[in-house]
Swiss-Prot record:
This is Small ribosomal subunit protein uS5c. One of its GO terms (cellular component) is small ribosomal subunit. It is found in: Plastid, Chloroplast. Part of the 30S ribosomal subunit. Contacts protein S4. Pfam families: Ribosomal_S5, Ribosomal_S5_C. The gene is rps5. The N-terminal domain interacts with the head of the 30S subunit; the C-terminal domain interacts with the body and contacts protein S4. The interaction surface between S4 and S5 is involved in control of translational fidelity. It comes from Trieres chinensis. It comes from the Eukaryota. GO terms for molecular function: rRNA binding; structural constituent of ribosome. Keywords: Chloroplast, Plastid, Ribonucleoprotein, Ribosomal protein, RNA-binding, rRNA-binding. Its main location: plastid.
Length: 185
């Protein structure tokens, strides 16, 4: 009986190790930590808000927000939220995006264009962090509108979510890539 229990515990530990290994593939980058307060009749209650970008540098990225009484717990909550909001994006062979795309969230507008190999990530602030964590190495991005860090990160994710590959477009239009028909615009 006790040997069976030991084997079960060993297998649970092995599963936990495998989970930890799969979690280690993800990169977490902190964008911002803010001290926020809630005013109650007893006074001001201070807490912390963390904004984190989570990704595997291979086409998956998500933005998470967490609030807690201390910085460590806020960061943990933001990481968990980022993992819940992961999206998969297509990346070209030159580690760029397949086509121009615009991402909008609130008053933020992000314009992203593919760039030649070796040009690097030309973007600022939280958009740069989102693109790097997603695994995009060659892209040009411009922020328009609001300078809000969280909304800019979410606008970048929204734009990346709108990316499509050639095969997806052909499938949507009921065409085949090796068809001899001309596509009229």
């Amino acid at each position: 009986m006790s040997t069976d229990l030991k084997q079960v515990n060993k297998s649970k530990k092995a599963l936990q190790r495998n989970d930890n290994l799969s979690e280690s593939k993800f990169v977490e980058r902190l964008i911002k930590i803010s001290r926020v307060s809630k005013v109650t009749k007893g006074g001001k209650k201070l807490s912390f808000r963390a904004i984190v970008v989570v990704g595997n540098e291979n086409g998956q990225v998500g933005v998470g927000v967490g609030k807690a009484d201390d910085v460590v717990n806020a960061f943990k909550k933001a990481k968990a939220d980022g993992r819940k909001n992961l999206i998969k994006i297509p990346i070209t062979k030159s580690l760029s995006i397949p086509h121009n795309v615009i991402g909008i969230f609130g008053a933020c507008k992000i314009i992203m264009r593919p760039s030649i190999e070796g040009s690097g990530v030309i973007a600022g602030g939280s958009v740069r962090t989102v693109l790097e964590v997603a695994g995009i190495k060659n892209v040009i991005a411009k922020q328009l509108g609001s300078n809000n860090v969280l909304n800019n990160a979410r606008a970048a994710v929204s734009g990346l979510n709108n990316l499509t590959t050639k095969s997806q477009v052909l499938k949507k239009r009921d065409l085949h890539s090796n068809s001899s028909e001309k596509i009229n615009s």
